[in-house]
């Protein structure tokens, strides 16, 4: 090759630390430039000698210049063919912008993605279904939820709504809050009025009754007729009533007290305006038939109670059976304010809370929680749970900073039937901190029993929330190996471990083990444990029950608080430790127990009860609330979380169910909940609403809050009104009912008539609707709920105006026959929902068949905005969501999401889930800072039937980030089952969106091995991995294997491989000579890029390099080497767009390979035949792209025979964007080198002469060139941003830390763009800032290159590789 060519190929690098050296030092820049210069050096030389070409002198001139002035001339000679280079970049930009429609996409329609496996999915949806996965900052005006279900039928025939929210932080609920831990027994069956238990609160203020009772191996509190309050270990407590503490061993104690008895032990500087006492009882029968009031306060410090507060530890006996009015238990709360009832209950090996007529509240370990409703969380395992709830049940788990205006809760249920036949609402929340509840708050852990069957009114459980405010109902329930919450008549709330919680309702936490607990409570029961600085205006208590029956048939109120410090009580305060005996049987009016609370303020009842191996609180008529560990949570609705395993879950909810898990900073105006269900049927026939919220922090609830952990028993069957349990709350304010109950190995809360809420571990969550999360395993759960159920889990800073929850369901039937709405929200952070939010994980069962109104599922969304419906569903090996009548939304893992509708996410596995839901179901999981104005949800379903016959709308949203949706958004991953057949209204699925704006309906659904979305009547939308996307209408894409998909979908298909590079169709090559005499390859295409017309600008203006354009015309089935093949001869023979190549190019290609050796291996994309073979192999769940026609698949889901080629295919697309970025950076380097020269040139000389050899030019021309260079730099920076966006679309599914370099690179780019764009001329450029900013771009690109190189050597199995073309007819 000639010396001039040599000089062109290898221009000398500038000496010294000049600006140009920043880009020059980058690896691969020179090769990116030289690749083009090289390929066309002979193309430049040959026309010079061509007889029909330019004169020989003209041809010789540039070569002479190169020889004479290599340093000067190299830049422009290199860039002489920039038009053709731009040609390639432009074509690639077009492609990249198509490829990355998951990000920066604008749609006027509805977008959705579906992965389906081994089943029929969504045949006959009448309106729209939206699913959104992994969204951040999503706004939904519809329904949002996420549900994990396993091995059972889930949510068939729910009549109204169920919401589940888990892990919310900073949640606001207007409902009830509570958390209950129940183990191996039946708990809270038939309590007639209210029972509140509060344990270990610190700095608690209670306006009701406070006390805490530890019971072991006996029967406790059966048939108390008036009121009993027990508070233990209080310090600096203020009581306006009775104060006392009793230590009893091996005998019968206080049987038949007619008026009032108060026992207080070891209190220091205590003031009680009510009744305060603490009782330690062992091996005997205790407090049977107290007619008026009994108060026990132990170890509380600076506690103020205006209601009833108490905490009870019960083991191996029957406890508190037949309480007619109310019982409140609050444990270990700190700085909690409750205006209602607060308590937390741990129950094991027994039946728990069966037939509670009114309300029961349990709050545990909440911190700075404010509840205006009811909050609780329930963990259920290996039994039937919550079958036949008549009104509402809400569950929330682990939410942080969540705001809910509806219901919020999260429930963990295992191996049992759960929440069958709840009539009104149940809320469960666990682990909230700083929770504010205006309703009822509690958390309950249930195991191996039947749980919450037939709740008529409300049940709320909230656990571990922090700074939670609830205006609705909030709770989280962990239930294992038992039936839970069957037939509660009114409300039950459980809240556990809240800190700084404020409750205006009932607050309490109950730990129950190996016995029957709280069966038939007539009015309200509240349990709160370990709250600190809690203020309760209602009832707060926490109960630990073990190996006995507890609190069966309380007629009026009972409150128990243990270990409160600085407690003030205006009502009854006390704490009782009971072992090996029967305790407090037949309390007619109110019993309050408060233990170890510090600086707690309660306006209702506060207490916590630990019950083991007995029957607990059977037949409560009024309310029970359980709240656990909430922190700074605010709810305006209902929040709860339920973990259910091995049972049937939430079948027959009539109104709404919301499930949300792990949301953070969530705002919801609808319903939010999350349900984890495993190996059982869950939530069948719930009549009204159930809310469960778990692990919320800084949650505000205006509804119901609670969390319930239930194991190996039946829990809370036929509670008539509400039960609230709050445990370990700190600085909690509850205006409703708050409590937390841990229940194991028993039946729990069967037959609640009104509401149950469970909230667990929420932080700073605000819910205006229903919020909760439910984990169900190996049992039947929540059958026949009539109104609403809400479950919220792990949300942080979530605001819900509707219902929010998340449900994990395994090995059972879940949520069959929901009539109204079910919402599931999981793991949301800073989420705002105006609708319904929830998340459910369901496995091995049929899921959500026959929902009549709406179900929303959202998973893993972050900072998502949705004005429509958003959700994501993962479904495997089962039929899912058949016959939903209205809408279903699933949202998972959203962050900073705002929902005005319903939000939830559902993971279903090996069971039937949510069959026959009449109204709406919403599931939201793992959302963070999500805003939804519509419906948002995500559903993971495995081995079961899912969502068949949805009548109205189903929305699924997963993992969306910064998405805004005005329509319906959701994402569903379905495997090996039938999914969403006959949805009447709408279902939307959206996955992995970030910063997405939707004005229509958006969703993403991953389905595998089944028929998907056949016969959608209106719209189905699936959107995956979109970031900063705006949709005004409907956008849909279906991805299906082994079945029919998207039948009758009236949307549009648009995908990049099929789009021709029409922009470049009319390119022509022309040669002109400008006044300087240099040759320039000009083409008409400059104008679209810069609008500059002077020939020297060609070096920085023009279409993409021809090798890329050629590749685009070939349909993107080429790699870099092929690009070069197509490009080099094109420049010789037929112009910019030629794609032919001949054997004479081999040496040049070999040389180019040498140039590219520094780039690593060059990979080839899969050709059409290979992609067809891949599609025929039915790879694991497909994730549809933002536009129809292609899909992505997790690398780990591909078979071994395809994995390597699919990896190479994905890397080829990454390299495609990488080379585009390198080429653009190389051009930027040249532009900055010119700017450098201009800034250094002496006056009177042409600055931007570009080596043209021209003499001085006048000022006007100089200014024009200045502007041309600046606009050229801006254009290149925009191109680079587009290239980065293309890289983003190829990096889906990677861990967050691996995606950070892309964000840093784009951020540095925007900074540099701002500096250049704000300068009017070259002189105005700030040299120092320019150097720093370019250095930042340089470093960010190096980090990006390292990431891409590491990805080639060590690709994670979670990487979504693609895009692959869908086979014809595979939509």
From Swiss-Prot:
Entries under Pfam families matching the protein: Perilipin
UniProt KW keywords: Cell membrane, Cytoplasm, Lipid droplet, Membrane, Phosphoprotein, Repeat
Positions of the UniProt region annotated as Disordered: 1-22, 37-86, 1060-1093, 1240-1260
Gene Ontology CC terms, in alphabetical order: cytosol; lipid droplet; plasma membrane
Nucleotide-binding in keyword set: no
Biased composition (Polar residues): 1060-1083
Cell compartments where the protein resides: Cell membrane; Cytoplasm; Lipid droplet
Disease: Myopathy with rimmed ubiquitin-positive autophagic vacuolation, autosomal dominant: An autosomal dominant, slowly progressive myopathy characterized by skeletal muscle weakness variably affecting the distal or proximal lower limbs. Some patients may also have upper limb involvement or neck muscle weakness. Skeletal muscle biopsy shows distinctive myopathic features including rimmed ubiquitin-positive autophagic vacuolation and abnormal subsarcolemmal protein aggregation.
Functional note: May play a role in triacylglycerol packaging into adipocytes. May function as a coat protein involved in the biogenesis of lipid droplets.
Family: Belongs to the perilipin family.
Protein's name according to its UniProt entry: Perilipin-4
Source organism of the structure: Homo sapiens (Human)
Gene symbol of the encoding locus: PLIN4
């Amino acid at each position: 090759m000639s010396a001039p060519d040599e000089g062109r190929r290898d221009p000398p690098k500038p000496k010294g630390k000049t600006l140009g050296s920043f880009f020059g030092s980058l690896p691969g820049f020179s090769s990116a430039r030289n690749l083009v210069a090289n390929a066309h050096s002979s193309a430049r030389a040959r026309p010079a000698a061509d007889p029909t070409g330019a004169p020989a002198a003209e041809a010789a001139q540039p070569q002479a210049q190169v020889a004479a002035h290599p340093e000067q001339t190299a830049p422009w000679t290199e860039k002489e063919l920039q038009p053709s280079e731009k040609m390639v970049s432009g074509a690639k930009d077009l492609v990249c912008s198509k490829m990355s429609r998951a990000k920066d996409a604008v749609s006027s329609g509805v977008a959705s993605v579906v992965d389906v496996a081994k089943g029929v999915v969504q045949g006959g949806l009448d309106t729209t279904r939206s699913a959104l996965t992994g969204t951040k900052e999503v706004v939904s005006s519809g329904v949002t939820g996420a549900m994990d279900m396993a091995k059972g039928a889930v949510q068939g025939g729910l009549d109204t709504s169920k919401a589940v929210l888990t892990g919310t932080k900073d949640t606001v609920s207007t409902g009830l809050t509570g958390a209950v831990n129940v183990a191996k027994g039946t708990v809270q069956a038939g309590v007639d009025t209210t029972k509140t238990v509060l344990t270990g609160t610190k700095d608690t203020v209670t306006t009701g009754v406070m006390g805490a009772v530890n019971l072991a191996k006996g029967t406790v509190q059966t048939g108390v007729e008036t009121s009993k309050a027990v508070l233990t270990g209080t310090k600096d407590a203020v009581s306006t009533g009775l104060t006392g503490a009793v230590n009893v061993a091996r005998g019968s104690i206080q049987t038949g007290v007619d008026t009032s008895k108060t026992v207080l032990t070891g209190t220091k500087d205590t003031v009680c305006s009510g009744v305060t006492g603490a009782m330690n009882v062992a091996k005997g029968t205790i407090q049977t038939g107290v007619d008026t009031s009994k108060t026990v306060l132990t170890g509380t410090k600076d506690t103020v109670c205006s209601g009833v507060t108490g905490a009870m530890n019960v083991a191996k006996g029957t406890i508190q059976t037949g309480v007619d009015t109310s019982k409140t238990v609050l444990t270990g709360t700190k700085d909690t304010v409750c205006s209602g009832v607060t308590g937390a209950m741990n129950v094991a090996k027994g039946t728990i809370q069966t037939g509670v007529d009114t309300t029961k509240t349990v709050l545990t370990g909440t911190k700075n929680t404010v509840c205006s409703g009811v909050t609780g969380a329930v963990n259920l395992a290996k039994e039937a749970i919550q079958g036949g709830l008549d009104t509402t049940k809400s569950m929330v788990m682990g939410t942080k900073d969540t705001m809910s205006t509806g219901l919020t809760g999260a429930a963990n249920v295992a191996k049992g039937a759960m929440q069958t036949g709840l009539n009104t609402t149940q809320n469960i929340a666990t682990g909230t901190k700083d929770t504010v509840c205006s309703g009822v708050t509690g958390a309950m852990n249930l195991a191996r029993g039947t749980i919450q069957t037939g709740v008529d009114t409300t049940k709320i459980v909230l656990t571990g929330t922090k700074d939670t405010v609830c205006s609705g109902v909030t709770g989280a329930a962990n239930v294992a190996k038992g039936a839970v919450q069957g037939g509660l008549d009114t409300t039950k709330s459980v809240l556990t471990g809240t800190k700084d919680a404020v409750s205006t309702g009932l607050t309490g936490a109950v730990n129950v083990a190996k016995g029957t607990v709280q069966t038939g409570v007539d009015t309200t029961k509240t349990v709160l444990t370990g709250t600190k600085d809690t203020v309760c205006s209602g009832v707060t208590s926490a109960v630990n029950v073990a190996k006995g029956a507890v609190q069966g048939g309380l007629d009026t109120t009972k409150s128990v608080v243990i270990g409160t410090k600085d407690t003030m009580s205006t009502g009854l305060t006390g704490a009782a430790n009971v072992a090996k005996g029967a305790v407090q049987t037949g309390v007619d009016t109110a019993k309050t127990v408060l233990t170890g609370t510090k600086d707690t303020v309660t306006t209702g009842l506060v207490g916590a009860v630990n019950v083991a191996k007995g029957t607990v609180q059977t037949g409560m008529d009024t309310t029970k609330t359980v709240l656990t560990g909430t922190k700074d949570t605010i709810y305006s609705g209902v929040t709860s979380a339920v973990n259910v395993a091995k049972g049937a879950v939430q079948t027959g909810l009539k109104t709404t169910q919301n499930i949300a898990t792990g949301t953070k900073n969530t705002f919801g105006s609808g319903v939010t909940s999350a349900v984890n269900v495993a190996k059982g049927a869950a939530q069948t026939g719930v009549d009204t609403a159930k809310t469960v919220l778990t692990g919320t922090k800084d949650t505000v609830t205006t509804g119901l809050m609670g969390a319930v952990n239930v194991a190996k028993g039946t829990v809370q069957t036929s509670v008539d009104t509400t039960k609230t349990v709050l445990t370990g709350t700190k600085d909690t304010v509850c205006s409703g009912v708050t409590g937390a109950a841990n229940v194991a190995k028993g039946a729990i809360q069967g037959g609640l008539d009104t509401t149950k809420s469970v909230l667990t571990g929420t932080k700073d969550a605000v819910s205006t609707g229903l919020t909760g999360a439910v984990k169900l395993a190996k049992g039947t759960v929540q059958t026949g709920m009539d109104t609403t159920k809400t479950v919220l889990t792990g949300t942080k800073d979530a605001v819900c105006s509707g219902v929010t929850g998340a449900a994990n369901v395994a090995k059972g039937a879940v949520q069959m026959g929901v009539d109204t709405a079910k919402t599931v929200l999981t793991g949301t952070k800073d989420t705002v929902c105006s609708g319904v939010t929830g998340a459910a994980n369901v496995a091995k069962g049929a899921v959500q068949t026959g929902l009549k109104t709406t179900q929303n599922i959202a998973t893993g969304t972050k900072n998502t905005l949705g004005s429509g419906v958003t959700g994501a569903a993962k479904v495997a090996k089962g039929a899912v969501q058949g016959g939903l009548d209205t809408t279903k939304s699933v949202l998972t893992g959203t962050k900073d999401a705002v929902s005005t509708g319903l939000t939830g996410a559902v993971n279903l596995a090996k069971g039937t889930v949510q069959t026959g839901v009449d109204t709406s179901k919403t599931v939201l999981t793992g959302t963070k800072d999500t805003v939804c104005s519509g419906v948002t949800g995500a559903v993971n379903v495995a081995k079961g039937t899912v969502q068949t016959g949805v009548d109205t709308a189903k929305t699924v949203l997963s993992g969306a980030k910064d998405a805004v949706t005005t329509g319906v958004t959701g994402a569903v991953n379905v495997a090996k089952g039938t999914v969403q057949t006959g949805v009447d209204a709408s279902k939307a699925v959206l996955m992995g969106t970030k910063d997405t704006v939707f004005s229509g309906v958006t969703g993403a659904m991953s389905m595998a091995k089944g028929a998907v979305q056949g016969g959608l009547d209106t719209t189905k939308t699936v959107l995956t991995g979109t970031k900063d996307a705006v949709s005004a209408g409907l956008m849909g894409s279906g991805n299906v294997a082994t079945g029919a998909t998207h039948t009758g979908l009236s949307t549009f298909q648009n995908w990049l491989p099929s789009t021709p590079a029409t922009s470049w169709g009319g390119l022509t090559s022309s040669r002109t000579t400008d006044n300087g005499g240099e040759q320039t390859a000009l083409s008409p295409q400059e104008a679209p890029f810069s609008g500059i017309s002077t020939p020297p600008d060609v070096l920085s203006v023009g279409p993409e390099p021809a090798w890329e354009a050629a590749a685009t015309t070939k349909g993107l089935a080429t790699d870099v080497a092929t690009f070069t093949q197509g490009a080099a001869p094109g420049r010789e023979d037929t112009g910019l767009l030629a794609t032919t190549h001949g054997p004479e190019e081999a040496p040049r290609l070999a040389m180019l390979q040498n140039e590219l050796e520094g780039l690593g291996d060059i990979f080839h994309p899969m050709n059409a035949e290979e992609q067809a073979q891949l599609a025929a192999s039915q790879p694991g769940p497909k994730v549809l792209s933002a536009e129809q026609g292609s899909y992505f698949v997790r690398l780990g889901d591909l078979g071994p025979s395809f994995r390597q080629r699919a990896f190479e295919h994905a890397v080829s697309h990454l390299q495609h964007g990488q080379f585009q970025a390198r080429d653009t950076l190389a051009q930027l380097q040249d532009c900055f080198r010119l700017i450098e020269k201009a800034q250094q040139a002496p006056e009177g000389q042409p600055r931007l002469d570009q080596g043209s050899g021209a003499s001085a030019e006048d000022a006007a021309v100089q200014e024009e060139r200045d502007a041309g260079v600046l606009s050229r730099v801006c254009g290149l920076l925009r191109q680079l941003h587009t290239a980065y966006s293309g890289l983003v679309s190829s990096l889906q599914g990677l861990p967050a830390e691996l995606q950070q370099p892309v964000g840093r690179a784009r951020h540095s780019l925007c900074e540099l763009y701002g500096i250049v764009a704000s300068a009017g001329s070259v002189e105005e450029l700030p040299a120092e800032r320019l150097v720093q900013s370019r250095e930042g771009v340089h470093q960010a690109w190096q980090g990006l290159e390292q990431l891409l190189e590491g990805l080639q050597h060590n690709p994670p199995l979670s990487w979504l590789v693609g895009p692959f073309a869908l086979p014809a007819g595979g939509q």
